[in-house]
Design a protein with these regions (language model features):
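N-terminal pre-Walker A segment at the start of P-loop NTPase domains
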Residues: 1-16
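Conserved catalytic network of the ASCE P-loop NTPase/AAA+ motor domain
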Residues: 13-15, 76-80, 107-113
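Walker A/P-loop nucleotide-binding motif
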Residues: 16-33
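Hydrophobic positions on the alpha1 helix immediately C-terminal to the Walker A/P-loop
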Residues: 34, 38
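Conserved catalytic segments around the Walker B and adjacent sensor/switch elements
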Residues: 40-56
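Short glycine-rich substrate-engagement loop in P-loop NTPases that contacts/grips substrate
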Residues: 51-78
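Conserved P-loop NTPase "ATPase switch" module shared by AAA+ and STAND
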Residues: 80-98
């Protein structure tokens, strides 16, 4: 997908309740390159979520991390400037120890801002 096409999708997302766009593809399929191109073209902030979130989670005991994770992710997003935030390397959200529903969490944080997230996997029919 070209970044101009993605830009149109981002604009269209502004009017939706969940302002979430997923760039879905297998590992090493170019998702990060698309996000980095958006950084250059549109100046959107880019967050390596696994890196930033893992650093923040170290501040909490293991038993509290599951409960605090949604608020921590929301705070990470809130600390960025801009209406559209690009999230890459979201694999930490799938860690079974954190007991999260990654899609639901991304939907939740996308209610107030456009979120473009790189999602490793495939989309078949209506199944992610």
């Amino acid at each position: 997908m070209r970044t101009d096409e993605l830009g149109k999708q981002i604009e269209a997302a502004r009017s939706r309740y969940y302002r979430l766009l997923l760039i879905v593809g297998p590992f090493h399929s170019g998702k990060t390159q698309i996000l980095l191109q958006l950084v250059q073209d549109a100046g959107c902030p880019y967050i390596n979520l696994s890196l930033v979130l893992s650093q923040k989670l170290l501040e909490y005991p293991h038993r509290i991390r599951t409960l605090r994770l949604p608020r921590i992710v929301e705070a990470i997003i809130d600390d960025t400037v801009g209406d559209t935030v690009l999230l890459d390397n979201i694999e930490i959200l799938f860690d079974p120890a954190l007991q999260q529903d990654p899609l639901r969490l991304l939907q939740y944080i996308s209610r107030t801002r456009n979120i473009v997230a790189a999602w490793s996997g495939k989309f078949e029919g209506r199944t992610l």
